[in-house]
């Protein structure tokens, strides 16, 4: 499927937002796991 510039831009925005959300959740999860495990300190 060939996307128009507008469509590919919109798709790219969703991909970037999804990646940001995923990274944010992963960072929070790792931080919580790190603070919840005393043997890492």
Curated annotation (Swiss-Prot):
Ranges in the topological domain labelled Cytoplasmic: 1-13
Topological category with respect to the lipid bilayer: Single-pass type II membrane protein
Pfam families, per database record: LHC
Topological domains, Periplasmic: 37-41
PROSITE patterns, sorted: ANTENNA_COMP_BETA
Binding site for a bacteriochlorophyll: 12, 30
Function: Antenna complexes are light-harvesting systems, which transfer the excitation energy to the reaction centers.
Subunit-level organization: The core complex is formed by different alpha and beta chains, binding bacteriochlorophyll molecules, and arranged most probably in tetrameric structures disposed around the reaction center. The non-pigmented gamma chains may constitute additional components.
Protein name, per record: Light-harvesting protein B-800/820 beta-2 chain
Annotated organism of origin: Rhodoblastus acidophilus (Rhodopseudomonas acidophila)
Organismal lineage: Bacteria, Pseudomonadati, Pseudomonadota, Alphaproteobacteria, Hyphomicrobiales
